[in-house]
């Protein structure tokens, strides 16, 4: 029922909501609370549903599942802390005086949101005679919905400050045609090839069935002074792991969907860091590991 790993278990359905942090003002604590307070009942109300299948009813009786997630966390913190936070990331998130101050502020935001979610969900359950879930927060993969607001998915950094967004449409789709009218580039989908297996280059070729619409995109903080000088692709695996564990320790009660990008020389430090965190009881760890594209190309 859940291939993504943000909720662990068996015989259950996920009731999930997501807050788009990239749309919130870091200085507006009340606005943040309102967003997470609204997300709580939006998942808790689904606990009123009665399953027809007995094993699902029993699973919910044992452990009612809800999960309030977020996306755009990286964007939110860039807006909160500015370019110095990005430069600290580029340095590996070291535990300097500045770094410890950043971590303390990150943790404060995360813990505040978690408390708000718990209070909202439990208040709803108490008022409607429902059993309280004992875990209310998670971070789901968030890739598709993040496209709606241009958020960096989940807690992850974006791939770059500026990039080309490619969206697949069927050929002659009205939205794709509108994008073309507004100046977007259109190319054949990678599934469209000629008799020799070569990619087509004409979107109006009769053999073409799908289009890729190319939309130039920049993150919301791309024009902050100095922000575009930070090479995001060089963020270390351990820096990513450290930030992931901040989320896991201070916000997430279920599990944090995490994909860590690495190069070969980072495998041992990452393995040691994961092992040490488990040994120190710092929280459940479940990571997807992906080699960086430049590391694969160098092989």
Where are these regions (language model features)?
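A broad, low-specificity signal for short, low-complexity segments enriched in glycine/proline
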Residues: 33-36, 96, 107-109, 220-222
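Amphipathic, well-ordered alpha-helical segments in soluble domains
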Residues: 39-42, 69, 117
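Internal maturation/activation junctions in enzymes
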Residues: 47-57, 65, 72, 77-141
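Catalytic alpha/beta core of large soluble enzyme barrels
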Residues: 1-10, 18-25, 36-52, 62, ...
């Amino acid at each position: 029922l859940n291939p993504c790993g943000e909720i662990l278990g068996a015989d259950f359905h996920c009731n999930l909501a997501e807050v788009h942090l990239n749309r919130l003002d870091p200085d507006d604590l009340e606005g943040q609370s309102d967003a997470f307070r609204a997300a709580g009942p939006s998942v808790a109300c689904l606990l009123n549903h009665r399953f027809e299948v007995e094993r699902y009813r029993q699973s919910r009786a044992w452990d009612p599942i809800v999960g309030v997630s977020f996306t755009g966390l990286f964007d939110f913190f860039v807006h909160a802390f500015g370019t110095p936070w990005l430069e600290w990331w580029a340095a590996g998130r070291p535990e300097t005086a500045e770094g410890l101050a950043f971590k303390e502020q990150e943790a404060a935001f995360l813990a505040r949101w978690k408390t708000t979610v718990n209070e909202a969900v439990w208040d709803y359950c108490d008022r409607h005679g429902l059993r309280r879930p004992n875990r209310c927060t998670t971070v789901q993969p968030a890739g598709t919905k993040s496209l709606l607001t241009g958020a960096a998915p989940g807690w992850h950094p974006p791939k770059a400050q500026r990039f080309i967004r490619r969206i697949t449409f069927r050929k002659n789709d009205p939205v794709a045609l509108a994008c073309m009218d507004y100046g977007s580039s259109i190319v054949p989908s990678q599934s469209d090839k000629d008799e020799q297996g070569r990619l087509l280059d004409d979107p109006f070729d009769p053999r073409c069935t799908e289009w890729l619409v190319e939309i130039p995109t920049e993150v919301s903080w791309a024009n902050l002074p100095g922000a575009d000088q930070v090479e995001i692709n060089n963020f270390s695996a351990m820096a990513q792991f450290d930030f992931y564990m901040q989320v896991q320790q201070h916000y997430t009660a279920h599990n944090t969907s995490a994909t860590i990008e690495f190069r070969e020389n980072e495998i041992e430090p990452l393995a040691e860091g994961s092992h040490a965190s488990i040994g120190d009881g710092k929280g459940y760890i479940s990571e997807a590991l992906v080699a960086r594209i430049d590391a694969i190309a160098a092989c």
